[in-house]
C-alpha cells in the first residue's frame, strides 16, 4: 500500500481525445480507472469541455451535455498547437468567450477532483496533496508549453 505521508504522485497524459492517469505505487505505474456517468468503468477521462447553461463542464459531464446538444469542444488540446496562443488567448463556445488558460486549468482541476472522488484511487482525502506530471503537447511551441505548465 502507498505511504499516506507522502503526496500522491500522478502522471497525466493529456491526450487529444482522452486523458489517461497513472499513479506511482512502489515502482509500479498502474492506470487509474474511473466510473463514467453511465456507470461504465473506463481507463480515461474524455478531453472535452461544454457549456451547461452558463457553466463550463468537463470530462464525463461535458460528454453528457454534448449529447444533449450543449455547445462543446472536443480535442481542445489542439488549440495549444497554434503558435499564436498565449496565456491571454480565448476560445469561443456558444456565445461565450473563454480564456484558454481557464479552460485548461478547469479541465485539470476536474481531473484532480475526479481522481479523488470517482476513481480506482478515490480514497484520496481532499487534504492530501496531489503531485502531477502533465504531458506537454508534442507539437506545441514554447509559449504553449509554458501555458500548459502554468
PLM-predicted stretches and their roles:
Residues 2-31:
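Gly/Thr-rich phosphate-binding beta-strand-loop-beta motif of the actin/hexokinase/Hsp70
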Residues 27-150:
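Phosphate-binding loop and its immediate beta->loop->alpha context
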